[in-house]
Amino acid sequence: MSWEQYQMYVPQCHPSFMYQGSIQSTMTTPLQSPNFSLDSPNYPDSLSNGGGKDDKKKCRRYKTPSPQLLRMRRSAANERERRRMNTLNVAYDELREVLPEIDSGKKLSKFETLQMAQKYIECLSQILKQDSKNENLKSKSG
């Protein structure tokens, strides 16, 4: 039996079809034949090694996406990235609104906004710690 004839019977890329016990079809295949042997000279070398991981890689045939599909995918990815960046920019703007202004009229960069937020949070934390210490002193002395 030639390789072309063999391919007609066995579906591509399914190593489970190499073993007679795993075939669920009523179709007669060379694998179901009583005369079939893995040592047969007509049996392809790529399948006679037991169907390891290398066989799966060889069997996979990826169809190259069409230029139209690639353009559509790129366009969709660009749109998702635009939305993500827009959301991030809105979040930066909202953060700038709650930070105290240092230079009126100058918009802080993203990096400056994050630095300013960090310093502002540290100052607020120190104020809270100082207030709690003052409360403790008042309660002990009072």
UniProtKB/Swiss-Prot annotation:
Residues 30-48 have a biased composition (Polar residues). SUPFAM superfamilies: HLH, helix-loop-helix DNA-binding domain. CDD domains: bHLH_TS_ATOH1_like. It holds the Pfam family HLH. One of its GO terms (cellular component) is nucleus. Keywords: Developmental protein, Differentiation, DNA-binding, Neurogenesis, Nucleus. GO terms for biological process: axon development; embryo development ending in birth or egg hatching; glial cell differentiation involved in amphid sensory organ development; glial cell fate specification; localization; negative regulation of gliogenesis; nematode male tail tip morphogenesis; neuron development. GO terms for molecular function: DNA-binding transcription factor activity, RNA polymerase II-specific; E-box binding; protein heterodimerization activity; protein homodimerization activity; sequence-specific DNA binding. Residues 30-66 are annotated as: Disordered. It is found in: Nucleus. Residues 72-124 form the bHLH domain. Disruption phenotype: Knockout results in ectopic AMsh glial cells and also ectopic amphid socket (AMso) cells, another type of glia, from a different cell lineage. Some animals are missing dorsal, but not ventral, CEPsh glial cells. Mean number of ectopic AMsh glial cells increases on cnd-1 or ngn-1 mutant backgrounds. Expressed in PVD motor neurons. InterPro entries: bHLH_dom, bHLH_transcription_factors, HLH_DNA-bd_sf. Probable transcription factor which binds the E box motif 5'-CA[TC][AG]TG-3'. Essential for the specification of the neuroblast cell fate in the development of peripheral sense organs. Its role in the generation of sensory neurons may be through positively regulating the expression of the zinc finger protein ztf-11 during postdeirid neurogenesis. Required for specification of cell fate, acting in concert with lin-32, in the development of the male-specific genital sensilla (simple sense organs) known as rays. Forms a heterodimer with hlh-2. This is Protein lin-32.
